Amino acid sequence: MHLTPREKDKLLIAMAAQVARRRLERGVKLNHPEAIALITDFVVEGARDGRSVAELMRDGGTVLTREQVMEGVPEMIHDVQVEATFPDGTKLVTVHNPIR
């Protein structure tokens, strides 16, 4: 199987998001990379499902709460920017202050 660098990045994010979901299920608080991966995966999959940029920008802030991440992580993540593929092309989605 031959994957482009972009496809490899998407696969890595999806796998990291899956690990993050399993940790949340066990009650383990997420670290910075896990939180970023989970929010990024939410945006990528939402775009694939046909949701709008505005919806994803809004709802990306509901993926995680402060209680689900390690201390200091919310303060480290001011914005998450994701290039996602929508039915009408690739767009940049920015989720501001994603962990509330």
From Swiss-Prot:
<comment type="subunit">
    <text>Heterotrimer of UreA (gamma), UreB (beta) and UreC (alpha) subunits. Three heterotrimers associate to form the active enzyme.</text>
</comment>
<dbReference type="GO" id="GO:0043419">
    <property type="term" value="P:urea catabolic process"/>
</dbReference>
<dbReference type="GO" id="GO:0009039">
    <property type="term" value="F:urease activity"/>
</dbReference>
<keyword id="KW-0963">Cytoplasm</keyword>
<dbReference type="InterPro" id="IPR036463">
    <property type="entry name" value="Urease_gamma_sf"/>
</dbReference>
<dbReference type="InterPro" id="IPR012010">
    <property type="entry name" value="Urease_gamma"/>
</dbReference>
<dbReference type="Pfam" id="PF00547">
    <property type="entry name" value="Urease_gamma"/>
</dbReference>
<dbReference type="InterPro" id="IPR050069">
    <property type="entry name" value="Urease_subunit"/>
</dbReference>
<dbReference type="GO" id="GO:0005737">
    <property type="term" value="C:cytoplasm"/>
</dbReference>
<protein>
    <recommendedName>
        <fullName>Urease subunit gamma</fullName>
        <ecNumber>3.5.1.5</ecNumber>
    </recommendedName>
</protein>
<dbReference type="GO" id="GO:0016151">
    <property type="term" value="F:nickel cation binding"/>
</dbReference>
<comment type="pathway">
    <text>Nitrogen metabolism; urea degradation; CO(2) and NH(3) from urea (urease route): step 1/1.</text>
</comment>
<keyword id="KW-0378">Hydrolase</keyword>
<comment type="similarity">
    <text>Belongs to the urease gamma subunit family.</text>
</comment>
<dbReference type="InterPro" id="IPR002026">
    <property type="entry name" value="Urease_gamma/gamma-beta_su"/>
</dbReference>
